[in-house]
UniProtKB/Swiss-Prot annotation:
GO terms for biological process: translation. Keywords: Ribonucleoprotein, Ribosomal protein. It comes from the Bacteria. This is Large ribosomal subunit protein bL32. Belongs to the bacterial ribosomal protein bL32 family.
Length: 60
């Protein structure tokens, strides 16, 4: 069975764990219909359009 040769220091452990919880920047693009920012390849939550077609009924 494999055994580590040396103990991993606390700072190395914390540095490795910190990468897991790092905030991920989300790419945003403007909706061609209303101009609001939305996530790519998803329905616009402001107007309900996706690829030029009405998909969701948005009540205002």
């Amino acid at each position: 069975m494999a055994v580590p040769k040396q103990k991993r220091s606390r700072s190395r452990t914390h540095h490795k764990r910190a990468k897991i919880y790092r905030a991920i920047s989300v790419p945003l693009e403007k909706c061609p219909n209303c101009g609001e920012y939305k996530m790519p390849h998803r329905v616009c939550l402001h107007c309900g359009y996706y690829k030029g077609k009405q998909v969701l009924e948005i009540s205002e």
